[in-house]
Amino acid sequence: MKLDFLINILLSDKPSKNIKFNEKQIFEMIPELSACKNFNQNNIWHIYDVYDHILHVVDGVPNSLALRMAALFHDIGKPFVYTEDENEIGHFYDHWNKSNEIFLNFISKYDLNEEIKNTISKLILYHDLNIEKLKEEDLLKLLNTFNKDEIIKLFQLKKSDLLAQNKKFHYLLDDYKKQQ
């Protein structure tokens, strides 16, 4: 299957609808995505399984290849790092690294502009970063890692990610608005 097929879906008006319509082909291209379907996250932050959460995030970001591709892969590693604590609460430690590994493995089969590939990778790796708790030196490192456009994309991804979670935590958007 060609990358253009996936790109056309991601850049459509309602990517989630087109992903679901072409689910068999998408799962053949990205088998790890099928592991996300019906994978319950078992924590108060999430109201959707991993797959539906991903689809909500993809729909929620602006129409940009880097953003939509990052949204598609941002939590794809969760089923592979899932643990539960003694209270049966689900945790996904280091899922951003696993998600990025899956993305890099996937994209290595295709010819995609290096700059876009690097932006997607950075967005996946940093999407779960708790920006408001960063120390000054960490914030400076972040600013050296991302250009201005990428910082904007990171906040757009984080916003869509938060909006696709439990509404009890949407108040955290106020923090993002202050930081932008």
Question: Language-model features: where?
Answer:
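Charged substrate- and nucleic-acid-binding regions of tRNA-handling and nucleotidyl-transfer enzymes
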Residues: M1, L6, L104-K109, L162-Q180
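Exposed alpha-helical structural elements
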Residues: F5, K17-N18, Q25-E28, E32, ...
